[in-house]
Every structure is written in C-alpha cells, then in structure tokens.
Design a protein with these regions (language model features):
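A short helix-loop-beta-strand connector motif used in the catalytic cores of GNAT acetyltransferases and
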Residues: 57-67, 195-207, 211-217, 232, ...
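Conserved ATP-binding N-box helix of the HATPase_c
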Residues: 38-63
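Conserved catalytic-core motifs of GNAT/GCN5-like acyltransferases
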Residues: 270, 286-308, 433-445
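Conserved acetyl-CoA-binding loop-helix of GNAT-fold acetyltransferases
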Residues: 100, 238, 244-259, 266-269, ...
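A conserved beta-strand-loop-helix scaffold within acyl/acetyltransferase catalytic domains
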Residues: 165-168, 172-240, 368-377, 384-389, ...
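Short amphipathic alpha-helix that is part of the acyltransferase structural core
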Residues: 16-30, 150-189, 207-209, 232, ...
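Glycine-rich/acidic phosphate-handling loop/turn and adjacent ATP-lid/helix
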Residues: 76-101
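Conserved GNAT acetyl-CoA-binding A-motif
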Residues: 120-121, 259-273, 404-414
C-alpha cells in the first residue's frame, strides 16, 4: 500500500509552537503502541517536532496557519505525515532543512518532502517496523522577505523577461503569496503542467525576476484550446510586498509587445470585480468591456491585500483588445441581442454585419466539446457547429452534469454559423443567458458566451466596474440573467 493510501488513526492540527511537545509525545506514544522500541520512538518524536517547527516558520497567508500531523500504520511501517498550506517548498530548500539532517542520522527510515499543488507542502516521515534505512528526499526552500522600504528599488532592479520552463516552481511560490492555495486554476500549482503549457505554446508568460532569481510577478496569455486564435490574457500575479510600484504595467507592456510580434488577432480577459485595478489596466491599453460572467468566481478565491467580500460568488468582467487587423464578418444573432451586439462592435471599431433571421440547422449532429473544472466548480461547453440535435444534445449534457452541481456552466456558440441565432433561443430555453461576446476566438470567428448559474448565492452588491460603460453592461447582463431565470422558474420552455 502506498503512503498516500494509508488511513490515519490520529490527526492533530498545530497552530502554535507551544503545542510542539504535545504533538511529539502523541507521535511517540502511538509509535510505541505499534511495537516500535522506545529509543526509536523518541528519535521519531524529535524529527516530527522539528518538522512542525519548520512548517510554522514558513510564511503563511491569512487562514492558512495550521500544520496538520497525521499518524497511520500498516503491517510494515509507521507513517507520520506533516502537511501545511504555507509558502510552497522549492527543491533546493529541503536539502538545507535541519529535519533532513536528522533523517540522514537515522531518526527516520524513509523521509520524503514534496509540494503537492493545492494540497500544499507534504512531508512523509516513515519508521519501518522491520528497520531498513533508505532515506529518500526531494525538495527545498530559500527565501527572505523583501524589506518594505526597499520594494521600489527591488522593482526597479527586476528583470522583465519571457518565462522559462525552469521558472515554474518560482511562479508557484509567487502565486501562493498572492492567493494562498485559492487560485481557481489548479494547473498553476502544478510545475509539470506549467512546463507543458509553456513548451507546447498553450501559455506564453512574462515574469519579473529579482537579481537573486526570485519571481515576484507574472502575466501572460493562454489559449483555451490549441486551435484558438485569440488567447486569454491575464493570470496576473504580483507579489503583495511589491505592489504599488507599477510592476504590473511593466509586465503587461512586454506581454503586449510579444503578442503584437506573434500576430495575435486580439486578446480577451476576465478581470476581477472585487476591485477595479485590473479593469483599468486593460482599458488603458485599449480593451473594451464585452460581457460579464456572473457568479463565476467562488468565495474561496482570495487575493492578499485586496477586498475579498464573502457575500456570494463574485463576477468577472469580460474585456477584449484588438491587436492585429480584424476583418468584417457576418454574425447570426437573434433580434433581441442585435442592439447590444452592434453597440459592442462599434466600441471595438470592428465591422460586424448582423443577420437576425432564424435558420434551421442543416447538419444532423452538433459538434460540442466539454471541459469540467472540479476545483473551480465550473463547466465549459463549446459548440463548434450547430446541428439539428442541439436541443436533445444540450438537454442530455445538462442531465449528465446535474449530479456534479456545477456552480456555473458556460456555453460558447459560433456566431459565424448561420443557425447560431436559432441556437441561442434553444440555449435560453435550457436556462442559459447572454454573458458576452469574444471576437475572433477561433479560426471560424466570433463566439457568443452564455451562462447558466447554479443555486449558489451571487454577490451583486460588490461588483465594482472601472467606468460607466462597464456599469451599463453589468446592468444589461444582470437583467438578461433575471429574465431567463424567471422563465426557468416558471417552467417556460417555449
């Protein structure tokens, strides 16, 4: 049985060093009860106390202070696991930890240190019931907090450059300082996933790196799907210790230069609405509000140093910035959405001819893909082509997803499809409301994004918009959602 599969018989949470002795004694007593000799149990007690001490010394964001100690045993080994949700350990720190030296001296038979993404830092300390020492270890920590008085100088000295795959552990630590373990994209806590995204081109990132190699800022753009032509910009992370010194602007400027050089049609973004900073930065470089994703961000997502109201799930502002030349297109939209569609196209300065007649699909089958984000509580459905079976297909998808109780389901419809207007009406009958428009998202053109929100509360009172255009769009999106929601509650599927 692997150590991860062993069921704990004892679990303690330590929040202060004064409890070290009690935790160590509990481990020692449990070890002796399992047949480990008292002198070996005492050594195990010592290394566990040291591990807890090291965890408590690591930097923690609010609400993540506790260190969990669990004990499990099977027929061959006695396992103590120490877990914390503090600053992620990086591979060079563990080699310098005092606990590692104790392990090498035989205080444990097996010793493994690891950062396991959103599960946090995990140390497995094992005593074999038939001792067979083969110490094994893998990770590390080296970091000193920046003096607040020197933050401006540090920002000035930061090297703004393209991110390399080897920077992945540093990005994870920077992300932790901003969000703890609450960031909704779990892949950004996974060094291998980050490296894959960079290597395959699904993500292109810019980082701010201090002279000592520490990453203190990140911004980039990523493609939802490999064949997309307009990436999502964002994933903005700036070390809270260095905010207020225009590091975001420097990062974004380099990111935008790279997008221009690579011939990207445009970039879209999801900006938080618990504060207006991200929206203002996007608008300052030519982005335009094109929608709002209501209740798309769980309350568990918290930003260090920013307001984090917990009155319900938070909303995200959709923005789009044209980068290259965008040619004219004809879009199929229902009559009641033509006005908002025309307004947004005019604001972006791109030509869109609107066709509002309802055209029945010609193809028999709908091309649809789905992506589930369990950590975020969201589902994304994307229709590549509208078929005659859309009504049935959409109903089947919703029934299949019902057991997951998703917080929100987003549905993308291809506006270049002559039957898109008909598809919108079908989607509305299934509880989807207008959320926004993303031009040139795919090689086939623009998509309409619709939203179907679960039964969780939405925080409508704390949606902060950077300007009046955003406020007007917010009000429109809320009104559309209320219209569809009333219809759904009445059971109206006409």
């Amino acid at each position: 049985m692997g150590v991860e599969e062993m069921t704990p018989s004892l679990e303690l949470t330590i929040i202060h060093e004064s409890s070290l002795g009690a935790a160590g004694e509990a481990v020692r007593t449990s070890a002796i009860a399992r047949g480990i000799r008292p002198e070996r149990a005492t050594r195990l007690e010592s290394i566990i106390e040291e591990l807890i001490r090291e965890s408590l010394l690591r930097e923690a964001v609010a609400g993540e202070e506790g260190v969990t100690v669990s004990v499990a045993c099977d027929e061959s080994s006695f396992l103590v696991t120490v877990r914390d949700h503090r600053l992620p350990i990086t591979p060079s720190e563990a080699r310098q930890l005092p606990s590692r030296r104790l392990a090498k001296l035989g205080f444990a038979d097996r010793f493994r240190v690891g950062f396991e993404g959103q599960s946090g830092n995990v140390i497995y300390c094992e005593a074999l019931l038939a001792s067979n020492h083969d110490g094994d270890l893998d990770l590390h920590l080296r970091d000193e907090d920046a003096d607040a008085d020197e933050s401006a100088a540090l920002v000035e000295a930061a090297d703004i450059r393209v991110m390399k795959p080897d920077d992945a552990p540093g990005l994870i630590r920077c992300l932790y300082r901003c969000y703890g373990y609450s960031y909704p994209d779990a892949d950004l806590y996974d060094a291998n996933a980050i490296r894959r995204a960079l290597t395959t081109g699904l993500m292109r990132s810019i980082v701010a790196v201090l002279p000592d190699g520490e990453i203190v800022g990140h911004v980039g753009y990523a493609y939802e799907e490999a064949t997309d032509t307009s990436p999502e910009s964002g994933r903005l992370v700036v070390d809270p210790r260095l905010r207020g010194h225009h590091l975001t602007e420097r990062l974004s400027a380099v990111r935008n230069e790279i997008a221009d050089l690579l011939g990207v049609s445009g970039m879209w973004a999801k900006a938080v609405t618990n504060h207006p900073v991200s929206q203002r930065l996007a608008i300052a470089i030519g982005s335009v509000e094109v929608g709002m994703l209501l209740g798309a961000q769980p309350v568990e997502v918290t930003q260090v140093g920013q307001p984090n109201p917990d009155d319900g799930w938070r909303s995200l502002m959709l923005l789009y910035r044209a980068v290259g030349e965008i040619g004219p297109r004809t879009l199929s939209v229902p009559e009641h959405l033509a006005e908002i569609q025309s307004l947004l196209a005019d604001r972006l300065g791109i030509t869109r001819v609107l066709a509002t007649e309802l055209v029945a699909p010609e193809r028999p089958r709908t091309a649809m893909r789905s992506h589930v984000n369990p950590a975020h509580g969201s589902v994304h459905l994307r229709v590549g082509a509208v078929g005659r079976d859309l009504e049935v297909r959409l109903g089947h998808e919703l029934r299949s997803l019902a057991r997951l109780r998703p917080g929100v389901i987003h549905l993308d419809l291809p506006l270049g499809d002559q039957s898109a207007a008909e598809a919108v009406l079908i989607a509305e009958r299934h509880g989807f409301a207008w959320a926004g428009w993303i031009p040139e998202l795919t090689a086939d053109g623009d998509v309409l994004r619709l939203q179907r929100i679960g039964d969780h509360p939405i925080d409508f009172d704390n949606i902060v918009c950077a300007r009046s255009e955003g406020e007007a769009l917010r009000d429109y999106v809320v009104a559309e959602w209320q219209r569809i929601n009333r219809r759904r509650l009445r059971g109206d599927t006409s």
